[in-house]
């Protein structure tokens, strides 16, 4: 009997192409987008239950996207990618509450 597949696996696999496209189009002016595409691909390709690695990748996505806040003038694809990645990152590594 195999273990159940985590709910984030299918969405991250589906976002792989969008992340690669955003990285290709925006990478020259926003280098973090090329890195983000690599992080998404790594997470999509990950196997097993390496929770520590998944947490690290989720945190890296959050860092690269400035907390999933698109830059001023970002295209719709960037907005869609960020909006889709944020809940995955929250499942893998819940954001720490901000201090007042």
Where are these regions (language model features)?
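Short, charged, amphipathic alpha-helical segments
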Residues: 33-38, 55-59, 75-83
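Cationic, hydrophobic amphipathic alpha-helical membrane-interacting segments
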Residues: 41-69, 98
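Alpha-helical protein-protein interaction elements
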Residues: 18, 22, 60-63, 74
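Charged, low-complexity interaction regions
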Residues: 24-30, 48-51, 70-75
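Solvent-exposed, well-ordered amphipathic alpha-helical segments
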Residues: 4-12, 46-51, 72
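Short terminal alpha-helical segments
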Residues: 2-40
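Amphipathic alpha-helical binding modules
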Residues: 63-100
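Short amphipathic alpha-helical patches
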Residues: 35-49, 85-88
């Amino acid at each position: 009997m195999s273990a159940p597949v985590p709910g984030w696996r299918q969405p991250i696999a589906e976002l792989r192409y969008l992340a690669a496209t955003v990285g290709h189009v925006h990478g020259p002016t926003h280098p973090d987008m090329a890195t983000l595409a690599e992080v998404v691909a790594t997470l999509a390709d990950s196997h097993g239950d390496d929770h520590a690695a998944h947490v690290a990748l989720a945190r890296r996505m959050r860092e690269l996207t400035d907390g999933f806040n698109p830059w001023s003038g970002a295209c719709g694809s960037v907005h869609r990618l960020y909006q889709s990645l944020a809940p995955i990152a929250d499942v893998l590594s819940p954001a720490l509450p901000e201090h007042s």
